[in-house]
């Protein structure tokens, strides 16, 4: 969406369209200011994006490294889990409607006592994509050149091309299309993994369609049917799934899964439609009211476990709290009990923003929470929606000595009045 072309004759290739590249992009118009983003001049530039980059924060002289073995897609996050045998796995979701869940298992093992020995773990290993079966089981399908149709006859010349065209490789293997997979969090003691599925307005639309096996579907263009892992059509409010690797082995190629929660609004009048029957797939399906135990929320995005095993959920819904969101209100960060599912709202956001990113000091007494793009969805001026974080200092005029106050992203620091552990 950040690339574009002023050439009216520009037509994206099937590979470019699979990654959302188009002549007009998302309207950012970067290509008009920087030729790097002009597809007419730099056709290969989009292939340099979509990779996980590793940075060593302790070494100022270090050079960031693109970890290409983890695949090329819209990595919303990456989380790792170290097994009891010191094998390690890295999990990541592709932040797009109808995309996939991935796992990378290095060939080597993690050495807890030698950080230098771990620096090259991400160079060699196996990238997998998930298939979630309706019976609650799942499979990790290897994205390996020469296997499962990833061959020159199907457009893959070598492992490098499999990685550059990760989405097409996953299409070829028949992975499960998910409702916009985003953040993943690992329980610090049980090893269970949780993933947010933010929304999917195309789920259950007619005529039904899937990502084409030959990889020629444009990004977010298919209308997948509902299934056990994505059981609601027009999944406005999203849900969170949970899975466990077989044998608690991070390198396992099988897992079991269930839905942790289906988000929603208990007071909404929105219905699933006369042609859809709640209760399919073993009773997992609920209406748009959701099955939250506690405070309502929707569009789950950020996800994080604190040191004490509490699950923190951050939302990325339409930021003006109207329409389907009028009862829920603005975006928020909530805390959930992973055992009971009980959820309580912890904080709400400024207007028209996303709450994203959270960490804490090791003692759990100070939280750092990201506030992203306040004032989004503006029509004429961003000042109509937000002047955060300066709005509290400039009064109703929203003016400073230097002119109009514009909204900015930022990080807030949160502590308890009594200095105690947050969440207690």
Predicted regions and their residues:
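Conserved small-residue
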Residues: 1-424
């Amino acid at each position: 969406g950040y690339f574009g072309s002023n050439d009216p004759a520009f037509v994206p290739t099937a590979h470019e369209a699979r990654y959302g590249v188009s002549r007009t992009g998302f309207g950012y118009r970067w290509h008009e200011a920087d030729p790097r983003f002009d597809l007419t001049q730099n056709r290969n530039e989009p292939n340099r994006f979509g990779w996980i980059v590793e940075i060593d924060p302790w070494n100022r002289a270090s050079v960031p490294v693109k970890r290409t073995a983890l695949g090329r897609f819209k990595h919303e996050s990456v989380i790792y889990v170290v097994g009891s045998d010191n094998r390690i796995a890295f999990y990541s979701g592709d932040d797009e409607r109808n995309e996939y869940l991935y796992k990378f298992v290095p060939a080597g093992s993690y050495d807890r006592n030698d950080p230098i020995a771990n620096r090259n773990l991400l160079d060699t290993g196996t990238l997998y994509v998930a298939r979630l079966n309706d019976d609650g089981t799942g499979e990790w399908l290897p994205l390996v050149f020469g296997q499962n149709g990833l061959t020159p006859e199907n457009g893959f010349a070598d492992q490098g091309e499999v990685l550059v065209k990760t989405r097409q490789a996953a299409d070829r293997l028949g992975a499960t299309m998910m409702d916009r997979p985003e953040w993943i969090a690992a329980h610090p003691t049980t090893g269970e993994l949780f993933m947010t599925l933010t929304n999917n307005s195309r789920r259950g639309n007619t005529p039904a369609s899937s990502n084409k096996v030959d990889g020629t579907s444009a990004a977010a263009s298919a209308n997948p049917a509902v299934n056990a892992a994505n059981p609601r059509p027009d999944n406005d409010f999203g849900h969170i799934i949970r899975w466990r690797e077989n044998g608690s082995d991070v390198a396992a190629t099988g897992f079991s899964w269930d839905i942790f929660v289906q988000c929603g609004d208990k007071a909404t009048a929105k219905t699933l439609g006369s042609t859809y029957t709640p209760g399919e797939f073993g009773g997992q399906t609920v209406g748009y009211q959701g099955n939250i135990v506690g405070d309502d929320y929707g569009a789950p995005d950020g996800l994080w476990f604190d040191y004490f095993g509490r699950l923190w959920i951050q939302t990325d819904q339409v930021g003006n709290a109207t329409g389907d969101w009028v009862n829920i209100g603005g975006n928020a960060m909530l805390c959930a009990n992973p055992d009971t599912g009980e959820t309580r709202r912890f904080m709400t956001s400024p207007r028209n923003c996303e709450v994203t990113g959270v960490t804490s000091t090791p003692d759990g007494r100070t939280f750092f929470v990201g506030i992203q793009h306040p004032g989004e969805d503006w029509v004429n001026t961003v000042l109509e929606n937000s002047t955060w974080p300066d709005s509290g200092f400039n009064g109703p005029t929203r003016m400073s000595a230097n002119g109009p106050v514009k909204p900015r992203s930022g990080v807030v620091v949160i502590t308890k009045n009594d200095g105690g552990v947050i969440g207690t």
